[in-house]
Amino acid sequence: MENKRELLKKVFNNEKAERVPIGFWYHFVSPKDHFRALEDASVMQRVIDGHKRMYSEMQPDFVKIMSDGFFGHPSVNNTKIEKAEDLYNIKSVGKDHPWMKEQIKFVKEINDTFCDKVYTFYNIFSPLHCIRLYFEEFEGDNKKFARLFLENPDAMAYAAQQIANDLDFLIEQLFKEVKLDGIYLSVQEVQDARADKSFHEQYVHPTDLQTIATIKKCSDTNILHICGYGEYTNDLHLFEKYDLSVINWATHTEKTTLKQGKAFFNDKVVIGGFDNNPNTLLDAGTDEEIEAYIKELLEDAGTKGVIIGADCTISPDIPVERFQLIRELGKKYAK
């Protein structure tokens, strides 16, 4: 019987492995429920049950544990923010808040199900990402984050610092109480042309890099997800200093292939290859088209330090047989 932990250990060490593994994940509840685990216990239970069902059906090579239900940050979720100055009302909630304690219990219950069989990574959003997601997913305002950020960068940076301080504790405590292998950190550039490189270096990098430093203190194997999809794009140059060991970006959205990205990120381990948008190859292609694509993908990118995955989260409706096929093709075309 295949030892998936040994397989992924080789891959995460950028070594030649018997096959190219796969890594796909999806959400378990609606966007608004992403923020509601503490007020509705059924949300948390659906996410826990969903992970267990996903593991049983998909038999993944490793697991990214979704933070569905714990998106955002309690102070953001419970503070009326209409103008940039309101961001100064965002405060750290501290180590005893239910958002800390219940989230750790939630991760542990999921993780204990399969951590002895596969590598596990817990999803953490960068401090600024926590704010953006609440405005966009819960309030439905896709322009608010950039508008307030550009209106008063210091106020947004202050709010992000409050969240970063809580994330430091959460991450450290997760590794003390849960047998996690690493963190999957989701980051994104500010979606506004006025937020240039110097803006990111002054207002985005400090809290992002603080979170990364905390993550690296806890584990050597972590995944950086540069979140792009649809109209959300990223300049990969903004993330050159984000020194985590495995990189996942939107190869299709950013028009940067696995081979190009692996070279750009100094030969780090990379995850990706498939567009995650609906009615694309992953969900709509034939088996023959999938095989031709993977053959071409691996001939181009190579098979050392490569994991076949997608730009971002995928639809939960894709039949599990598709992932079984991709896994077999990763073995067939391993050089």
For each feature predicted by the language model, list its residue ranges.
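Active-site loop segments of alpha/beta catalytic cores
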Residues: 1-29, 33-38, 50, 61-65, ...
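Glycine-rich loop at the start of a catalytic domain that most often binds anionic cofactors/ligands
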Residues: 34-38, 73-82
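N-terminal beta1-alpha1-beta2 module of alpha/beta enzyme domains
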Residues: 41-45, 49
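Membrane helical hairpin/interfacial module
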Residues: 48-72
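Active-site gating loops and adjacent loop-to-helix segments of metal-dependent hydrolytic enzymes
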Residues: 83-91
